[in-house]
């Protein structure tokens, strides 16, 4: 992405995203330790995305930090490619448990499940049975729980969007420079003639100096 941004420079804006309907949740893909797939990590990924010289695309549920849904049977999947992957894994000699593990990690159903608006039976999305089961974390990760709390992921994204809107000359139109760091830190500088911001993101599990 940094290479693309440098090549485009002032010619055009790239479209940047962490998630879409054809991939698992970004917290599961990009955060190795399951214990770290939390609000802090979701904000970090948001920081990586929102201040680039690009048009950021926020996929439904990303703004509240939704993560993959662990399913206990292949019958719980709707995505045809997930069923094909499961069958192929069995044909290659993997056990049913191993095949299901692979599918849970990779399935497109992870980002195709209903939006979690609240902790009710169908997550505030509907009052009838859903085409896919509600995410198992819906009672903890939902819009209603986050909407009035400034410390949650949703507030971070709202503030980041407001910051972009208030600083178009800097964050949208300003220059972009990737900063030289170690492999576990992603940092970049945005600047115009009078202001600058430096965005530093520690992707490791330890404090960095």
For each feature predicted by the language model, list its residue ranges.
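Active-site and adjacent substrate-binding regions of carbohydrate-active enzymes
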Residues: 1-209
């Amino acid at each position: 992405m940094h290479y693309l941004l440098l090549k485009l420079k002032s010619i055009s804006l790239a479209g940047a995203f962490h998630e879409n309907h054809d991939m698992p949740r970004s917290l599961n893909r990009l955060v190795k330790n399951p214990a770290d797939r939390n609000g802090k990590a979701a904000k970090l990924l948001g920081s990586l995305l929102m201040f680039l010289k690009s048009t950021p695309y926020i996929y439904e549920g990303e703004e509240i930090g939704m993560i993959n849904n662990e399913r206990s049977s292949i019958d719980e999947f709707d995505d045809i490619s997930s069923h094909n992957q499961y069958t192929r894994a069995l044909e290659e000699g993997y056990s049913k448990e191993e095949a299901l593990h692979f599918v849970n990690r990779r399935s497109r159903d992870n980002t195709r499940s209903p939006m979690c608006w609240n902790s009710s039976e169908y997550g505030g999305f509907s009052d009838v049975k859903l085409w896919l089961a509600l995410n198992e974390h819906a009672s903890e990760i939902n819009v209603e729980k986050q909407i009035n709390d400034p410390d949650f992921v949703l507030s971070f994204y709202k503030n980041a969007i407001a910051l972009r809107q208030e600083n178009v000359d800097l964050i949208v139109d300003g220059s972009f420079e990737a900063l030289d760091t170690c492999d576990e830190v992603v940092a970049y500088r945005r600047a115009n003639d009078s202001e600058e911001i430096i965005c530093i993101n520690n992707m490791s599990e330890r404090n960095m100096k």
